[in-house]
Amino acid sequence: MMTQANAYFYDGADVALLNGQYTDVFSLLGMHSANEGKALIVRCFLRNAISVDVISIKDGRKVASLDKVNEQGLFAGTLGRRVKPFLYLLRVEYPLCQLDIVDPYQFDSLLNSDDIYLFGEGSAERAYEFLGANWRQTQGVEGVHFCVWAPNAKRVSVVGDFNHWDDTRHVMRQHLANGLWELFLPNVVEGAHYKFDLVYQNGERHTKSDPMATQMECAPHNASIVPPKAHHSWNDTAWMSKRAATAWHKAPMSAYEVHLGSWRRKGEQGEQYLDYQDLIEQLIPYVKEQGFTHIELMPISEFPFDGSWGYQPVGLYAPTHRFGDANGLKAFVDACHQAGIGIILDWVSAHFPKDPHGLVRFDGTCLYEHEDPRKGTHPDWDTLIYNYDRGEVRSFLLSNACYWLREFHFDGLRLDAVSSMLYLDYSREPGQWLPNAYGGRENLEAISFLQILNQRLYQAFPGICMIAEESTAFAGVTKPTDQQGLGFGFKWNMGWMNDSLSYLGRDPLYRQFHHHQLTFSLMYAYTEQFMLSVSHDEVVHGKGSLLHKIPGDDWQKFATLRAYYGFMWGHPGKKLLFMGCEFGQRNEWNHNQSLDWHLLAYEPHQGVQRWLKDLNHLYQAMPALSVQDYEGAGFSWLDCENSRDSIFTFVRYGLAGDAPLVFVINMTPQLHTGFRIGLPLAGDYREYLNSDSQIYGGSNQGNAGTVVAESLPWQGMAQSALITVPPLGCLVIGPATGLAEAN
């Protein structure tokens, strides 16, 4: 019998298949024409099977019983008089059960030539729809289509719960021209764990997580997970329409940066993360109440190490398991939109970690990264750098950006560590980097990728915001790509942040000698579309909280912090503030625990929180604070040279008919009475905000809510007034009817 059965296989093919060395598996397994088209033959490999019958799917009838070729599980047989291929299943008898298995080797390739072309070209925006694990239906049969890019692998198999992690069971179809491997598996269930088992050219075997997996196991496990079929039903049409019609560079934008794992926790010891439903019920109402327009989430792509805060993602397409599943995340974003809150995602495209189950040497070669460590390794973070010159890598990243914006309705991306992408010598000594083709230090491939990314995303997703964390003086970060810029919508103003926080930490007595640290930013404020950012990076790793940075007793600390926020909200540029800063968190941020919400039992912390809330609401109510953020006409110093008193006075202007606002910021504890300031209009003024008010925890020094202009020219204005300037305080003054008109 064995001799007869072996005739079903080519010479040595059965041995090669059993040893996992037969790569053109579709030419062997499945249904094939035999005997010069006069018969059909079916071959299959099913370990531990006792017998196998071929059943027609159309009528459920048994067509043939296959011969057992050997004890390892090879079966084969001809199908009587049938000569035309048909859909079939294999009825398999095992020692303890009987299973009906739809043979995956009877199906043709499900890949589309256009998709393949765009992927290789570097312009695919939906590569996740054919790469990874996607539910598909072909010839009326439902299953999961697995596909992975591994051009230099000798063999690739899908292994998982559905085949007992047997690497010889489901060898994939190889496409030599483009390096893709695919297999359609009908007998897979939602939630099944899987990986790709790769044989390298040197014979080594390595099991890798799916680079395009949309769900992954939690550490220390790292299997990919077949996604559910159900999808979220969106209810944010009104928001998406409004977003598309909004010019954000002219609109108020106040972002609340959140690390979901430590904003707030639950459990007796605070050991449990809030899930997305908790966040819908707690975070969204809080952000709305505080008046922020946006939430910016620190990275939520799957990452194994909590201490990386998400900045070393291994599953770039998989929302982290920590807070729920993908549909839970979509429900959270949907709820944000229904509450009128935008949501920005922190996106990591500058580097990836070396975890062995991830992208590193994925198919035995440097596929996603550069081979040369002078271009492929980040010395600071011991991570790897994407090869931005490779079309498939660009498609991987471009599709990922589109994935978060299209499938999850995020309102934009904040790109981490853009500076490290732009320069080949970033954090490297001479001799540790390679110049570009022109001998320069600019990473031309990364620059091109960023330009294409921004151009494509702004075109595909109207109303989004693309934000760069870029800490150098690279020109044109927010300049349009058709003018040789990078095409971002906004750039974090790291210069303003460093200067202002340095100033904040100085004793008030000596601030007069560092006055320029708060005025210099206006020298370059209109060179880019800036976002003023006080992010997580400024309150961690020994830097201390904002409150901790400020010298003096508690009264001075809280008063100074309120005045600083007043200056920040009055300064041109969009705003970003890290969670906890809005109520004066005392300890520096710890990702392993909740913020210190108990501090809100104390009035000084309540005062800072109330001050931020009122600043945000004024910011949204008064167009002067946003509509000309990036136009010189929107800002005018009244006095930027009063270093002796450390007082800063300026005016913010809107368009014609918008009420102007005057800011007076005093950064010393000295009270000033009879202090004259210029005013842009005649008439009565009111104190819209006074950070020294008792309701904010101040000493209640001010102007009793009103200021009257007189026709005495001062500071370049035709009108002026004598006012009281509170100690370590911020005043916001405007025409008495301005707020009512704005509302």
From Swiss-Prot:
It catalyses: Transfers a segment of a (1->4)-alpha-D-glucan chain to a primary hydroxy group in a similar glucan chain. GO terms for biological process: glycogen biosynthetic process. It comes from the Bacteria. InterPro entries: A-amylase/branching_C, Branching_enzy, GlgB, GlgB_N, GlgB_N_E_set_prok, Glyco_hydro_13_cat_dom, Glyco_hydro_13_N, Glyco_hydro_b. Keywords: Carbohydrate metabolism, Glycogen biosynthesis, Glycogen metabolism, Glycosyltransferase, Transferase. GO terms for cellular component: cytosol. Coiled coil: none annotated. Pathway: Glycan biosynthesis; glycogen biosynthesis. The active site is at D416 (nucleophile), E469 (proton donor). GO terms for molecular function: 1,4-alpha-glucan branching enzyme activity; cation binding; hydrolase activity, hydrolyzing O-glycosyl compounds. Belongs to the glycosyl hydrolase 13 family. GlgB subfamily. Monomer. This is 1,4-alpha-glucan branching enzyme GlgB. The lineage of its organism: Bacteria, Pseudomonadati, Pseudomonadota, Gammaproteobacteria, Alteromonadales. The gene is glgB.
